Amino acid sequence: MDTAEIRSRFLNHFARRGHTIVPSASLVAQDPTLLLVNAGMVPFKPYFLGDLATPWPRATSVQKVVRTVDIENVGRTARHASFFQMCGNFSFGDYFKAEAIPFAFELLVDGFGFKPDDLWATVYLDDDEAEGIWRELLPAERIQRRGKEDNFWSMGVPGPCGPCSEIYFDRGAAYGREGGPIADEERYLEVWNLVFMQYERGEGAGYDYPILRELPARNIDTGMGLERMATILQGVDNLYEIDISRPVLDLAGQLTGRRYGADPADDVRLRVVADHSRTAAMLIADGVVPSNEGRGYVLRRLLRRAVRDARLLGAREPVMSELFGAIGTAMGPIYPELVDNAETITGVAVAEEASFAETLRTGTTIFDAAVRQVRSTGAATLGGDEAFKLHDTYGFPIDLTLEMAAEAGLSVDEAGFRRLMERQRQTAKADRAARRIGNVDLSAFRPILARSGATTFTGYEELSRESGVVGLVGIADGAGLTVVGEGDEVGVVLDATPFYAESGGQEPDFGLLRFDGGEVEVLDVQRPVPELVLHRVKVRSGELRLGDRVQAEVDENRRRAVSRSHTATHLVHAAFRRALGEGATQAGSLNSPGRLRFDFHALGAVPPSVLTDVEDEINEVALRDLPVRAFVTTQEEARRLGAMALFGEKYGDAVRVVDVGDYARELCGGTHVASSAQLGAVKLLSESSISAGTRRVEGLVGIDAFRYLAREHLLVSQLSTALKARPDELADRVTDIVGRLRDAERELDRLRAAAVLAGAGALAEGAEDVGGVAVVTAEVPAGTSPDDVRLLAMDVRGRLAGRPAVVAVVKADGSSIVVVTDSGARSAGLRAGELVRNSWASLGGKGGGKPDIAQGGGGNSEMIPAVFAKLRGLVAELASR
């Protein structure tokens, strides 16, 4: 049974049982706690949690999935792959265990032909209900109980979870010992996991996590790996050898000069090349590009592992382009984006392959030298400093170094590597302020500090003061200067300054330094070392000399706008802690003129109603005109007073506390308004996730908030006029319009499809007889959708029932072609995929597919006559054999 048939039987089985078939979502997870979709249920997570109303009570899908947590096992076992397709059926508070278990059993036995005697089931330790249901289907001795590690499912991050029941297939004594799944999971192969989604879990490593609550409804989430099922039903040893994977595996062998099956070690690498290249193609098709972080790093790692193994197998030329072509042929019929965007997808992979080839060439030389050095001393461990150099200088990911070292029989000092990485991060953090100023060597400030002492900050009390210039520093080289002139950009250190240096999430002050005969503009203010304030300035006029006296003037409007934002952030922090609990602590912030960004710890999205309540409370506090007071005290006293200290921040013995009346109290070194009424208004604009367990709120303060509200009011007025509705009727009116538009679009789609099919009868009647095969070739308008092109081709084929038939339909601009064949034509050796490759692809296009249907893209209108002629010739040649 081919993979397409397995897929079809699965979906149809559940469609007949009231499930809506839902297309696969993108691999790029919309869930902010995930980089990539790593389970079939991920697109349904909001429905399981009750965050969104469920469009259907039951659903079924075949979802694209990427998992790289076990990447080292890919190619080494029969069941590990980084990309797979997860068949699933889902119930959202509709049915539960009593239906889910028989649904699965019926499909396995009646749909896929499994013998009941070959099936085993496992249930969670205390799940008597599930075991009782299974006992109606299997004997008790083939039902086993297992613990949390095996039979309690979660995605590995906060979210839905629950006990599960797994179904196993006994492959026979040749594959291992008796005793069921508990004894041997190589012999007893898991084919289906039925998750009884009842709970929501919290943060925690491994299996040590809290259960937060029961979900609003008891749900079902099942997962049956399509490739694993194909492995069993096609009678092959592993999922790399099934119908959609074997062509890529064989091509990897051809490109590297190694025959699959000849050498076990080579086979592992060939499987890695085939697996990783397929996963990479699917990721790129969904918009992921290689990078050094996030999902881009996952892609880069996969591509680089594939390239390295291909080269170790003997490939001397790039391989990704050809591999991606084979992947498009194998997977394109199900995922047409692989064909439609083949050029872009392949281009990304080829560029990354070329880049890594140079990295690999240089880095491998350095690695080999390091290995020789270790062996010459009789040691067995590669130093952390060598691993760090490979990573930092040559772009070698640590996992690649670990893998290569293991192959060389060495271990790696990972702890030493991590220490050096942490030191680099700390150095980067400490030096960030200086880098903002320029490439200034921190040693440039030592003589200034020794000569003049620390900079005195007076900006809490004043916005203008006379100060002395105690340091001039070149931005480009950090050199000490004595005089600068018009147009120069330099760093200026004053003995005392009212300018606030960026820190604590507050942006720096801007302003002017005036002196006899000229002035300079202050563009940025940083603390490159704790004791000194460095002003990055541009000389507008005159010459500024070391030792000059200047009038330092802070831009008052900017300072007040930033101060409003900072005070508002304190209120936002306090309001969220009141609304969500003491755990909603600040994780970061940015206070700029009229705008704030506040990051805080929270397990899930903040409901809109809570955001509204928080905003209302903040504005009520502002209207109370509470005094804002700052004072310095000891850490111990500040704690006694209940002042909030920010996680991750370090404080000295003396700390500055900022109070907003009796509402908020925090340790803070920033600038603030004098009273809460000076905020004017606060408008929260958005709430989103920035990482697992961290949310972000952005908002406007003061005149910026008023302007936003005025624009919103004007927009509502304009919409009310345009839609002839009161403001409180707008939502219903827009919903109605959108609904009618959707209905009109559906009707338009129906009419368009009908128009396309209107000519199907005439095309069938005009079929040419080529060697006893009915051949139809047709052009349709360039604007015809790919779905309608396929629909027309299959409709014409249906009208030719009883005669061997080949139907080819191409868009007039040559952008795509679909070829279909019936069983009679296929019996005569006419396979759609080969016809596309030998006609369309041979003349400059790209494409391929299955024996019954294939498609191509990347052509042009000029090649259509030649394609049709070649197609007829191929039919004549093959039909005459």
Curated annotation (Swiss-Prot):
Q: Where in the cell is it found?
A: Cytoplasm
Entry keyword Iron: no
Primary subcellular site in the record, as a coarse category:
cytoplasm
Give the first-level EC class, as a single word: ligase
BP GO annotations: alanyl-tRNA aminoacylation
Tell me the residue numbers annotated for binding Zn(2+). Answer: H566, H570, C668, H672
Which GO molecular function, any one, fits this protein according to its record? alanine-tRNA ligase activity
Details of cofactor binding = Binds 1 zinc ion per subunit.
Gene3D superfamilies, from UniProt? 2.40.30.130, 3.10.310.40, 3.30.54.20, 6.10.250.550, Bira Bifunctional Protein, Domain 2 (3.30.930.10), Threonyl-trna Synthetase, Chain A, domain 2 (3.30.980.10)
Name the Enzyme Commission number(s) assigned to this protein. Answer: 6.1.1.7
Q: Which reaction does it catalyse?
A: tRNA(Ala) + L-alanine + ATP = L-alanyl-tRNA(Ala) + AMP + diphosphate
Output the Pfam families linked to this UniProt entry. Answer: DHHA1, tRNA-synt_2c, tRNA_SAD
* NADP recorded as keyword: no
A single GO CC term, please? Answer: cytosol
Q: Which cofactor does it need?
A: Zn(2+)
Q: Mind listing the UniProt keywords for this protein, alphabetically? A: Aminoacyl-tRNA synthetase, ATP-binding, Cytoplasm, Ligase, Metal-binding, Nucleotide-binding, Protein biosynthesis, RNA-binding, tRNA-binding, Zinc
Supply the domain comment: Consists of three domains; the N-terminal catalytic domain, the editing domain and the C-terminal C-Ala domain. The editing domain removes incorrectly charged amino acids, while the C-Ala domain, along with tRNA(Ala), serves as a bridge to cooperatively bring together the editing and aminoacylation centers thus stimulating deacylation of misacylated tRNAs.
Under PANTHER family, the record lists:
ALANINE--TRNA LIGASE, CYTOPLASMIC (PTHR11777:SF9), ALANYL-TRNA SYNTHETASE (PTHR11777)
Its family?
A: Belongs to the class-II aminoacyl-tRNA synthetase family.
The protein's job, in short, is: Catalyzes the attachment of alanine to tRNA(Ala) in a two-step reaction: alanine is first activated by ATP to form Ala-AMP and then transferred to the acceptor end of tRNA(Ala). Also edits incorrectly charged Ser-tRNA(Ala) and Gly-tRNA(Ala) via its editing domain.
Q: What's the protein name?
A: Alanine--tRNA ligase
**Organism of derivation:** Frankia alni (strain DSM 45986 / CECT 9034 / ACN14a)
